[in-house]
């Protein structure tokens, strides 16, 4: 238990265009070297492209895309008597969203399109349609948890 007072959680203000906290958080994850306006342009452009192809509202497309990426289970290493077990644990709701966002940005950057906007739009659309690298990452995480189900009683 920490002896100091608990640190207050920073409140993230909603983004200016869609007035949505999830979009604001994703902008912060995309941002490099403090260039927020560049990150905003990239994400807003990607959301418009994805929404145009999906035929829905940009925020709805993004939220459905993130829902398709969110992991329900993950594995954590637990050392028991000289050997390390991969113990499956349920993912906290805030961590689900943050992992989904990080995976979305990571795998969109690994894509072969030319601009960041196109890369993001492509990965958002793929995740929206339940395919793509970020969704594969979620499936792999779930498979890993399922494979180590025998160690679930080591949860803490």
UniProtKB/Swiss-Prot annotation:
| Subunit and partners | Part of the 30S ribosomal subunit. Contacts proteins S9 and S11.
What family does the Swiss-Prot or TrEMBL record give for this protein? Belongs to the universal ribosomal protein uS7 family.
Key words, A-Z: Ribonucleoprotein, Ribosomal protein, RNA-binding, rRNA-binding, tRNA-binding
Answer yes or no on keyword tRNA-binding: yes
Q: Which residues form the signal peptide?
A: none
Mind telling me what this protein is named? Small ribosomal subunit protein uS7
- Purpose: One of the primary rRNA binding proteins, it binds directly to 16S rRNA where it nucleates assembly of the head domain of the 30S subunit. Is located at the subunit interface close to the decoding center, probably blocks exit of the E-site tRNA.
Pfam families (alphabetical):
Ribosomal_S7
Q: Tell me yes or no: is Ribonucleoprotein among this UniProt entry's keywords.
A: yes
Q: Which organism is it from?
A: Geobacter sp. (strain M21)
Which GO terms of the molecular function aspect are on file? Answer: rRNA binding; structural constituent of ribosome; tRNA binding
Task: Enumerate the CDD domains for this protein.
Answer: uS7_Bacteria
Per the record, the GO terms for biological process are: translation
- Note the InterPro entries from the entry: Ribosomal_uS7 (IPR000235), Ribosomal_uS7_bac/org-type (IPR005717), Ribosomal_uS7_dom (IPR023798), Ribosomal_uS7_dom_sf (IPR036823)
Provide GO CC annotations from the record: small ribosomal subunit
């Amino acid at each position: 238990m920490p002896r100091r007072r608990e640190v207050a959680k920073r409140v993230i203000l909603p983004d200016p265009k869609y007035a949505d906290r999830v979009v604001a958080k994703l902008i912060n994850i995309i941002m490099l070297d403090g260039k927020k306006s560049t990150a905003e342009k990239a994400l807003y452009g990607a959301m418009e492209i994805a929404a145009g192809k999906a035929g829905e509202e940009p925020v709805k497309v993004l939220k459905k895309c993130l829902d398709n990426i969110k992991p329900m289970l993950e594995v954590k290493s637990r050392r028991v008597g000289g050997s390390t077990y991969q113990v499956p644990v349920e993912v906290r709701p805030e961590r689900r969203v943050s992992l989904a966002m990080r995976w979305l940005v990571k795998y969109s950057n690994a894509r072969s399109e030319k601009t960041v906007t196109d890369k993001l739009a492509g990965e958002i659309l793929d995740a929206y349609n339940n395919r793509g690298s970020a969704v594969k990452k979620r499936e792999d995480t779930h498979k890993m948890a399922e494979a180590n189900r025998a160690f679930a009683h080591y949860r803490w």
